Swiss-Prot record:
Main location: cytoplasm
Top enzyme class: transferase
InterPro entries assigned to the protein according to its UniProt record, in alphabetical order: SET_dom, SET_dom_sf, SMYD5_SET, Znf_MYND
GO molecular function, one term: zinc ion binding
Native organism: Danio rerio (Zebrafish)
Name of protein: Protein-lysine N-trimethyltransferase SMYD5
Length: 415
């Protein structure tokens, strides 16, 4: 059963404003639902701001000391601490330290398990939603605790670059176990798209690799031992657990936070004399070179979340909106990339900028493998006569002339 429209806006920072700006409509049986503008938007306008139903930092990311608030994923390192760790330069001093927005004096630990939060508000919010169930207390570092065994098993089958976390599933169960309004939360979670059994297997295969059947069984057993709930018994069956994995694998929205990135943006906004501006820009350029040499591409605290309203956005290779996290936490800002008129569908891209510039065939290959649909956006339709082969620099890796599955959907829904 799909969530009522009122529920669709329930996680927005200003739900009344959001419901006056956009509308979720059923399009057809192929595309499912979509998000539509109810008023005009200009380029750069914030369409809505939304918090996730649940979110979680990736497990390898946390293990490698990317310190983030357990609840909202706000980066906990100061910009200088972050820069020192990423660059491998422990004596590095950042100019303009006043531009760092991290406030260590506000950080709080759970008194039972010592998990860290960026504020008392986040600690209380986690406790109110799921942490009473998931708090390990003095067993936080016990490798034999069922939740720790579940996390270790997940890390053993899902390596960086990460795209999901089994703790999203754990928080879904813990939320329902802990809440008084169990029916409402179950309704919210079941709002996300459903798949056929074969499609679910493809998604799980993508997440867990060739031996996914055995790995999925192991994870289900550990998940059941750690979190079984009679009311949710269907979620713990082989079919139900596979469906949960499919839901998170298809609908999870990546979240990235960085205190250093926030500091750099604040530096860019400074009004400085020319010489000082050149010196600061040179310092930042060199810092990123040092970080690239030491750390590579892994700069952010990374995780994912389930966003109810944003999940209604369909994909386009020429999107008119994009999701970002400018507040250095899990609050998703959906922003217009161009002017959007009333009644126009609001689409995002499931591809990054580099992927969107690749050939139609390459784009379709990525979308098929990760989201199980064939795109029929304006750009793809205009390139229908292009040869069915990947870009020249991709041919050796991906092969030539792969045919598109006739049974694939024309459009993605609910991601």
């Amino acid at each position: 059963m799909a969530a009522p429209v009122d529920d669709m806006f329930s996680r927005c920072v200003d739900s009344a404003k959001a419901s006056n700006c956009v509308d979720v409509r059923f399009i057809n049986n192929v595309k499912g639902k979509g998000l539509f503008a109810k008023k005009p938007f200009k380029k750069g306008d914030t369409i809505f701001i939304e918090r996730p139903l649940v979110s979680s930092q990736f497990l390898w990311n946390a293990l490698y000391k990317y310190r983030a608030c357990e609840y909202c994923l706000r980066a906990l390192e100061t910009a200088e601490e972050n820069a020192r760790r990423l660059s491998g330069l422990p004596a590095l001093i950042l100019p303009h330290p006043e531009l760092c927005k991290v406030r260590p004096d506000r950080h709080q630990a759970c008194p039972q398990c010592q998990v860290m939060y960026c504020s008392s508000e986040c600690r209380q919010a986690a406790m109110d939603q799921y942490h009473k169930i998931l708090c390990l207390g003095p067993s936080n570092d016990d490798p034999d605790h069922p939740v720790n065994k579940l996390q270790d098993a997940w890390r053993s089958v899902h390596f960086p670059p990460e795209t999901s976390s089994v703790m999203i599933l754990a928080k879904m169960v813990a939320t329902i176990k802990q809440t008084q309004d169990k029916e409402r939360w179950q309704r919210l979670f079941t709002n996300f798209c459903s798949r056929t059994a074969n499609e679910e297997e493809e998604i799980v295969h993508k997440l867990l690799g060739e031996k996914f059947q055995g790995q999925l069984g192991l994870l289900r057993n550990l998940f059941t031992t750690a979190l079984y709930e009679d009311r949710l018994s269907q979620w713990f069956t082989p079919e139900g657990f596979r469906s949960l994995f499919s839901l998170v694998g298809t609908n999870g929205q990546g979240i990235g936070t960085s205190s250093l990135s926030q500091w750099v943006h604040a530096c860019d906004a400074l009004e400085l004399p020319r010489q000082q501006r050149e010196q600061l820009d040179a310092f930042i350029d060199q810092l990123y070179k040092d970080i690239d040499k030491e750390t590579g591409d892994f700069l952010n605290c990374e995780g994912s979340g389930l966003f109810l309203l944003q999940s209604s956005c369909n994909h386009s290779c020429v999107p008119n909106a994009e999701a970002s996290f400018p507040e250095n936490n899990f609050l998703l800002h959906l922003t217009a990339l161009g002017d959007i008129g009333p009644g126009e569908e609001i689409c995002i891209s499931y591809l990054d900028c580099c992927q969107r510039d690749r050939s139609r065939h390459s784009r379709h290959k990525i979308l098929r493998e990760n989201y199980l649909f064939i795109c029929s956006c304006q750009k793809c339709l205009s390139q229908m006569d292009d040869a069915d082969m990947t870009s020249e620099d991709e041919e050796e890796v991906e092969g030539e002339g792969e045919t598109e599955g006739e049974d694939m959907e024309d459009e993605m829904t609910d991601v």
